[in-house]
Amino acid sequence: MPTHQGQEFKKTCSPHFYPLSNMAKFNDIQLLRTTFLRGPSVWTYRPVLEVWLDLGELEDYPSNKIPGLNDRLTAWLPDLIEHTCGVGERGGFIQRLEGGTWMGHVLEHVIIELLNLAGMPAEFGQTREISKRGVYRMVFRCPEEAVARVALEHGHKLLMAAINDEPFEIKPAIHAIKTAINDRYLGPSTGCIVDAAGERRIPHIRLNDGNLVQLGYGAAQRRIWTAESDQTSAIAEGIAQDKDFTKRLLAACGVPVPEGQIVATPEEAWEVAQDIGFPVTVKPSDGNHARGVTLELYQEADIKTAFALAQPEGSDVIVERFIDGTEHRLLVVGGKVVAATKGETVSVYGNGTATLRELVAVLNLDPRRGPEQEYPLDWINLDAGAVKLELNRQHVTPDSVIPQGQAVLLQRNGNMAIDCLDDVHPDVAYYAVLAAKIVGLDIAGMDMILKDVSQPMQGQGAILEVNAGPGLLMHLKPTSGAPRPVGMAIADHLFPREDGPGAGRIPVVGIVGTRNNAFISRLVGWLLQLSGKLTGVASSEGMYLANRQTQKTNTANWAGAHRLLTNRLAQAAVIQTTARSILEEGLAYDRCLVGVVTDMDGFEQLADHDVLEAGQMRRVMRTQIDVVLDGGAGVLNADLPEVADLAELCDGEVVLYSTEAANEFIAAHRANTEVQHEGGRAVFVKGNQVVLATGAQERVLGTLDALSLAGGKRPDTPALLAAIATAWALDITPDLIGAGIKTFEYQA
């Protein structure tokens, strides 16, 4: 299956072109159909948006026949020079533009470049002409449909403006795509975990429009929501949210924490501060992200003001002893410290002419500063209560002109974005892990105050807070130091490496074709169930779980398979699909353990997809074999040469089946010792017997008469062989296969 960007656009230029002099503007390229393919498809393994384009009169005007087109495109999108296209070298696409390529191909590259500029590299696109002149199928990779459609809209507008020599504003287009990305994409914490799981070939399913994600399939799945997992208990999270109770719990277990007390009024805050001793910290009891926290307070007025700042951020307000030192955030995952950062105060320095407001405006231009979920450093807001309090303590206002060299402190806490993992003393790590265990969190962010993180904890630091669902961005994009692979640490915690390469996966069997595939699906599901796995089946005859029908309508589609793969009870899944579903939706799974192709019938029903002859079905049906895992198997009908020829595409083993023992494909496969030392595996009928063969070795499973279903019902022979071959590919024993067939009660 092709996966590279901008595969060569194969079309030769027509010799007939019309002059452009005195010609009216070109009509818009028509977008006839848009289809989001959510899984592996005829194009690639990942989601793509497929667009049918009608070029209209532009069919007669490739890129080298429209004066100024290429100059306008490269002026708006200068990085098109980086697109290699089918040429395979930098500038390849520019060569195609200059030599003449059609507008569907140009639109593909325009959209890819807009996505690149918006911060989401697309990396893949293709354009192919269909049987109708001037109509093309164009696809580009994008994991989110809403983002893809926005990119298509603006790419279309940009191209038409370039064609017709009209103005176009590139910045608003990029901004619109960025907005769609921010609205639809996973947050940085969730995203880095999903990406890490992907590196280990663990599949994921997004369960809502937010950050709730399933990693893995069926019973092997785990769920995450930002940096929380399904191992994060509600009780532990509730404890962590109650800062005062957390401190008391930690103190009872010998963990150093600052002395403090919940207060109800500003007056009580002042009284408690006097009892504890100055300086003090005032903060909300259940806040986060350092909101409402004010440090190192001495004065009554400041303490009462700090109370007012903390109160809206939590249910209660805490006054606690201020501990001198530097703020640190240690990330604990599965009983290990996997990342650590420290903070620093934020100050600006006067130049004798600029106001504080002007100095802060310059500070906020730092590209590392921005909205807290996207950037390691926050913007400084002079209207924020904590900042105002700091300025009041220094007797300056936003409009004060700051003398040359004078420092103005703006922020004492937050923005712990300087990596320091390599400096963490084992004793400090011990207390961080201990605190996480006491609270009961598998993933926790420890806010600690330390004079020196490289020294033992006692006497020079304390744990301030234990945070559930900690932000990970500070560890992914520290302002100084090395980024840490925190996403992989969490993925490894959820799916231990010792689980092997199949972590997160259940046996998935994918079956495509038209010949009794519902029967095959259900019989394979029954045999898997007998082998000890609670098995789900999604077929055209409904959905089954543990051989119990849970849905009567057709589930041989993306939606049915998706429901099955999200079911936490399913220890194995058998999924029937169709050529139409592959063309209109894509497969619902990224890979399967066994892929079965029974036939390539049905092109007559696919004319609306420009499938007009039998030979075109190979491109569709190969999708099922393309997704077979390298440790899996492809099961192919050797009675049909066009199906047997798919064997060359399979990354795993191939098991053939045939109604004839003398089948030439079977004979060649059994003799092939390059793939398997003993020779290939095959299932066939010899006389009246069903034979399982590995190379020259043969085992009789039983006669066709003996392999009847419960009640003596005789199944269709090719369908029976397909099911037997699939079960055998799943390493179900021949004895169990034979016994299971005889006990299978089938009613369509």
Q: Predicted regions: what is each one?
A:
Residues 15-199, 336-339, 344-358, 406-512:
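ATP-dependent carboxylate activation and anion-phosphoryl transfer catalytic cores
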Residues 498-549:
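Walker A (P-loop) phosphate-binding motif
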